[in-house]
Amino acid sequence: MSQLCPCGSAVEYSLCCHPYVSGEKVAPDPEHLMRSRYCAFVMQDADYLIKTWHPSCGAAALRAELIAGFAHTEWLGLTVFEHCWQDGGNIGFVSFVARFTEGGKTGAIIERSRFLKENGQWYYIDGTRPQFGRNDPCPCGSGKKFKKCCGQ
């Protein structure tokens, strides 16, 4: 029985993010790493999240916090709306909206994530959360105002 990938690609999970999350393959670019990390949140795979965080971030110290967060969060969907590279292709950025429910409330993470490529492998470094006015267009591309979409 096939299952669509949680990353929103509309591709079967086994053909999409599973090879990265399982360690069979290394994500070839920041967008694939972002999508596979989202899948790891959905599937509650702290090991993959820690492995794909840049070593300088000390992600192993966040293991208990990650696992505790899994119990209270249901991920609803991911929309990637921009990705780009800099510094000869060794630094990448992915902008996205990740929707979730937590404690009965719906929310969204809107982030521009920064990735670094070292020794042929991409790592998540950090992210910034852009500020949007309530009447600005939603960055997810829905055509709605931010306040009526991801800003709820």
Curated annotation (Swiss-Prot):
SUPFAM superfamilies documented for this protein: NTF2-like, Sec-C motif
UniProt xrefs under InterPro entries: NTF2-like_dom_sf, SEC_C_motif, UPF0225, YchJ-like_M
Coiled-coil region list: none
Highest taxon in the source lineage: Bacteria
Any one Pfam family match given in the protein's UniProt record, by short name: SEC-C
Protein family per UniProt: Belongs to the UPF0225 family.
The protein's name: UPF0225 protein YchJ
